[in-house]
Every structure is written in C-alpha cells, then in structure tokens.
Amino acid sequence: MSRLPTVLLLVGLLPALGGLDAVSAGARHATTEVAGELAVARASTSEVRLDGVTVRPRANTRQVVTVNRTSGWHGRVTYWTRTDGQWTKRFRARDGRIGYNGLVRPKRRVQGSGKTPLGTYRLPFSFGTHPQRAAWDPSYRRIRSGDYWVLDNESRHYNRYRNKSRGGFRWWLPASHADSSERLRDYPKQYEFSIVTSFNAAQVRRRGGAIFLHVNGSGATAGCVSAPRWFIKRLMPRLDQDRAPVIAIGS
C-alpha cells in the first residue's frame, strides 16, 4: 500500500488469500481488555450487528473482529466468538487505528488514498517477523529478505505477497512512484504480527490492497486497521480457518 508521511503508520499487506503467490503494561492505559465479558447477540449466517458494526459472516463463521470508528482515525477493535447460536465478546482494544483519511465504500477506494474500506472480509492467513509457532495457523508466513506486497498495477501479481526473486513485478520502483510495491521488512514494528484481509482479492487495478490488521505504529494507518501489540499477539493463536474468521469494518 502507499507510504505514509513519517508521522503516520504505514499500512499493511496480504500473502496467499487462498491461492496467492506463495503486551506491554504501558499499552493498557489506552485499551481495555474485556475477556470473558458477555455481550451477546443472536447469530446469523446473513447479517448481524456487533458493537454497532454490521457483520456479514460466512455460513460457518465462528470468529469475528469488529472495527468501530469512534472519531477521526481512531477506533474500537473487538474480538468475538460464536457458540450455540450466540456471539460473545472476548476482548477489546480501544486504541485501534484506521486510515488517515477515514473510511470509504470498497468500490470507491483508490490506491494511495489513505482510506480504509468498509465491509466484511475474510482473514485467510497471517505473517510476521517471528518463526512459526505451534499455536498459529499453518498458513502463517515469516517475512524474509526480498518479500513484498505487490502494488504494481501492471503486474499480474497485483495485491499479492511475493518475493522479488520470483520476478513478475517492478520491485525496484521508488516509494514515490504510484506503482511501487511494499517491502515488508521496512515495517518490523507494524508487521511483527500481521493478519491479511481479503479486500480486493479480485485484483481490481487502482483500487489498492495490502489491507491488514496489524500492530499500531505511531499514528494513523494508510488504509489498514491496526491495534495494540497485545491485542494482535493474543488474537493470532486464536484464529482458526475451520471457523471462517472475518473482520467487519464500520462506523
């Protein structure tokens, strides 16, 4: 995704959307965990409202992350699970972030706009700076030298995770270029723990991509959703593809 000014957090990325190229105590003053607190809503396979956000889960979805913008580029990020037909709130971060230019309907999003797409998206896999851990989904990828998120509009690998050694995109373009791709190792803090969303899996050119759920940086994102480190770290081992996890972004 396009780069941000240095005072802002740069946004995230996306490896194999099902066939792509292959907590500190100080943070808790701004966030609130609500593990075990019940905030139950009737489950639905078509649409449900959780924390004021409209969620359109898949038929077998049992895990949801909601993102509710509270003001500007700030938001509340909550993890929910479904059991016996009811949705239960498990934990929440109040210091979530979205794009520096707010929210936008997905079909109106433009690459480099700094806007986060509204809607419900799958969470197909994760990546980060750490070696694979037993509790994480097997689809996890550890960032290695030469890994990029392709945002080159002329590449057939657009909006895909790819290593430059495999070619097929202009990885050498400078960050100032409209078709520059994102080198993942440039963001070790934000992408220490990062979860890919299925936004623009169809690779519509100029719509952008690299929309992730990742660790907070110093400010807003360039389109991703971010949350405190403790939240993402706690979420990672809980996500289970057999439970069809999704993220729902609203306001």
Predicted segments — roles?
Residues 34-221, 232-243:
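Cell wall/extracellular polymer interaction/catalysis modules
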